[in-house]
Amino acid sequence: MFKSNYERKMRYSIRKFSVGVASVAVASLFMGSVAHASELVKDDSVKTTEVAAKPYPSMAQTDQGNNSSSSELETTKMEIPTTDIKKAVEPVEKTAGETSATDTGKREKQLQQWKNNLKNDVDNTILSHEQKNEFKTKIDETNDSDALLELENQFNETNRLLHIKQHEEVEKDKKAKQQKTLKQSDTKVDLSNIDKELNHQKSQVEKMAEQKGITNEDKDSMLKKIEDIRKQAQQADKKEDAEVKVREELGKLFSSTKAGLDQEIQEHVKKETSSEENTQKVDEHYANSLQNLAQKSLEELDKATTNEQATQVKNQFLENAQKLKEIQPLIKETNVKLYKAMSESLEQVEKELKHNSEANLEDLVAKSKEIVREYEGKLNQSKNLPELKQLEEEAHSKLKQVVEDFRKKFKTSEQVTPKKRVKRDLAANENNQQKIELTVSPENITVYEGEDVKFTVTAKSDSKTTLDFSDLLTKYNPSVSDRISTNYKTNTDNHKIAEITIKNLKLNESQTVTLKAKDDSGNVVEKTFTITVQKKEEKQVPKTPEQKDSKTEEKVPQEPKSNDKNQLQELIKSAQQELEKLEKAIKELMEQPEIPSNPEYGIQKSIWESQKEPIQEAITSFKKIIGDSSSKYYTEHYFNKYKSDFMNYQLHAQMEMLTRKVVQYMNKYPDNAEIKKIFESDMKRTKEDNYGSLENDALKGYFEKYFLTPFNKIKQIVDDLDKKVEQDQPAPIPENSEMDQAKEKAKIAVSKYMSKVLDGVHQHLQKKNNSKIVDLFKELEAIKQQTIFDIDNAKTEVEIDNLVHDAFSKMNATVAKFQKGLETNTPETPDTPKIPELPQAPDTPQAPDTPHVPESPKAPEAPRVPESPKTPEAPHVPESPKAPEAPRVPESPKTPEAPHVPESPKTPEAPKIPEPPKTPDVPKLPDVPKLPDVPKLPDAPKLPDGLNKVGQAVFTSTDGNTKVTVVFDKPTDADKLHLKEVTTKELADKIAHKTGGGTVRVFDLSLSKGGKETHVNGERTVRLALGQTGSDVHVYHVKENGDLERIPSKVENGQVVFKTNHFSLFAIKTLSKDQNVTPPKQTKPSTQGSQVEIAESQTGKFQSKAANHKALATGNETVAKGNPTSTTEKKLPYTGVASNLVLEIMGLLGLIGTSFIAMKRRKS
């Protein structure tokens, strides 16, 4: 029968108690008090029997009390009748008078009865047959009551464990049957518990709304979300899946509420102020200020009625917290300065009044300390830099006033007996100064440009010591909050070890820095060291931390690497994913056109420009570190930082891209006031309000509030405007359509008209007014650019035509206004520049030296006029009557052909024809007149100053005496112009032959950037100064296949001017005078059978350039049709070349002179 431990203990106690009573009875018998003892025994026996007779539940029954299978666990209780106990006790009481043999027999009988009962209990249990036989055998072998009791306890314990095991198996089978039944039942999920939970959540939401824990917007949104969760649960296949899904969704339910924002603010405070979150000791004043700021923000959060207001409160708190964090070093620095000023003032007063016995410095010290402590509390509460500066000035002013009043009161003549020095906290005690030890390691630091510098500062003292970094902060004032970082390795009152890091040193930041340490007694020790920044000799590659200066290498803390390699690899993979996002964001940003700096964009642009270099350095360093697993920076800490930095840089790139897009929208719809209003109120950054120092969650919140939200609003406005435009213009214009061609033609027309207007003004402008053309150019350029912008946005060809005519009208009006201003300021008529006077033709003018003979022209070399034109082969005339000086004349100038002389400037009046001499004497020939400076062609006219500052690019180049100037209408991606003359005579002769004769010179024009040739599209104006140039010049483009294309050109101020949209080989043909009078038929552009194949000598221009110029094939010329040159006027240019009339007169005079010489020789 199964019994509990409690029942066993009761039986054992009863038996022992009976024996004890018997012992008392024996003692009483011998002491004469038997009756009394019997009564005691009887009463106690009855009470004990009654207690023992009371049934108690077994342990198994207690454990399984309410279980349905408790009946299975009930065991037979050991019931000891009262009569049996009396029988067991009474014999013991009488043992004193009975013999030992009888007593022993009774005990054996009782023991045997106990064995039989125990065997019956064993038979009635669920033990196995083997276990039952084992227990029975042990019972039979046991003859001692204690051993039998121990065996009984062992049997009960075994039986109990067996029942427990049986019960567990039953429960396991029961659950298996339930699972099987559930799977076989209908798949419909029982949502009773889920509905109950969701209804509870709805009541919680209603309660939070009543207590203003959430806004009405959040309330409606959350209730709707709960219903959505209910619907999702109803569609689940399994109850477990539904419950998991409900828990997940309910966890997200409160993320956007005021409660979530409240938690975010409190977590930020905990992160900044908790000693567990910070390796450095948190400043107490900073912690208190941050907690006060958080408390105010939480109060404002409770008052918020909309989500926008609540989010704004949270973002404002993060901004203020960041500013508070940034100002803490300045507060400390200001407090240090204040204590330093007090100490210096007191020392100075003490020196001045040390012989004044009446001066009580203790009062002054007390007042000074009171002021310093008062303002120390105020400074710690400062929220911004202006407030901090104001309090600092007030404190110094008050401190100075107190000291001055004390000085005036006690300053007297020196006393004979000096007063004993007052001992005070901040006095300068010379004996104690040596007790402060201040060291800097390394003392002299050398780093390269762009690297970080690290050094360690150690201070030891017998009393409390503070470090003063004010000189360091002044000389390396950080532009961002984390440029200078301080990491205290040891930070006790009398021992401090600080590791200082200064990031990204510039070349001009070599400094000598002084650090100070001061103890409570006012002792100050200074330590000076130098930081030298050198320029990198090799290619500038952003260095990884392993490449830093060797002196600081050993000072870098060896951070333990992560033991969990799988976790570290997951972190690296996550950082690489953020890097890919960053590179993608930068690539998308580069596809957006850059915006020139302007008041609306200046601050934003400066922020982005400042981020470019750190971004590139971070990317390069990260890629290098992940490729070297042996690096000590291959740790979880550094990869977490890279990941965080990449996420911050993504936000910077997105803010820049959104800004550029909005500027494009504003240019597209410049009259839309709503777009401009949103941009200026939200996205426009100022010096006081920008995100330059924000990072992580603060930067993300700033981006969402001030960039993403307003951009989405602007984008919606633009989309609506675009739809409206599409409705007004039903048929979209395809790319490269006639409309696009019309726009391009219109732009070219406006540009050409502007150039034509400028050329006309420049020709008639007086030389002294050349500088004024700059203002005119700027006005015309502005009209052109605005017109081009309007043309791009035009929708119809009629609109384009109107824009072009409007531009012409505006340019004409601008030029008229400009000319009117010139007439008012300049009375002279600025028709033409002043021309040097043509020397009066002598009786027998002598032809200039080295005339250019048409029969054998040399194209490559330009004719030069010597300084003193002397004819080397002119014989001296033996007799020269009536001529004091015998001029040198040519031997016999050829009369059939007029000599080719350089052109002279156009004269206002026709030269006077001298009358034929009446005498046969040789006429007096004057000295050979110096030709005017005009034959030496002037340099290419310089463009007005500032021409390239308003959207144009100007390049110049020279080759010998040839100079070229090229003007682009817009900035060009090139930095140098190259001019080279192709001197292959056969090439020039072939081109001359195919174009109808004349002098031909071939030039190669090209552009380069960074020393490499580049090809730039776009129209450009070429001005080529060749030396002496005739008035009739043809320009040809030599194509890749050898064809010649005639390009419209003109001669202006001695320069050949033409326009083209590319560079290659150009042939310049100058027609001789005979050709100018009687133009050949070949000058008319025509297309005949075969083409001229000209192989170019230069390499890299075309594929055929490697061929020899002698590969010019015979055949007819193919000349593209073009406008005839505009330089066929009779008006002489300013080149010094005389007209045909002058040549004829000079030839006639030469003929007359020759006749006189011939007649003189006959006479002799």
Curated annotation (Swiss-Prot):
Residues 911-920 have a biased composition (Pro residues). SMART domains: IG (SM00409). Residues 434-534 form the Ig-like domain. GO terms for cellular component: extracellular region. NCBIfam families: GBS_IgA_bnd_BAC, LPXTG_anchor, YSIRK_signal. The modification Pentaglycyl murein peptidoglycan amidated threonine is found at T1135. Residues 1-37 form the signal peptide. Residues 54-75, 167-220, 536-567, 823-947 are annotated as: Disordered. Residues 59-73 have a biased composition (Polar residues). It is a peptidoglycan-anchor. This is IgA FC receptor. Keywords: Cell wall, Immunoglobulin domain, Peptidoglycan-anchor, Receptor, Secreted, Signal. Its main location: secreted. It is found in: Secreted, Cell wall. Residues 199-438, 439-826 are annotated as: IgA-binding. The gene is bag. Disulfide bonds: none annotated. The keyword Cell inner membrane does not apply. A motif (LPXTG sorting signal) lies at residues 1132-1136. It holds the Pfam family YSIRK_signal. Residues 167-176, 183-220, 536-564 have a biased composition (Basic and acidic residues). The keyword Lyase does not apply. Residues 1136-1164 form a propeptide. It comes from Streptococcus agalactiae.
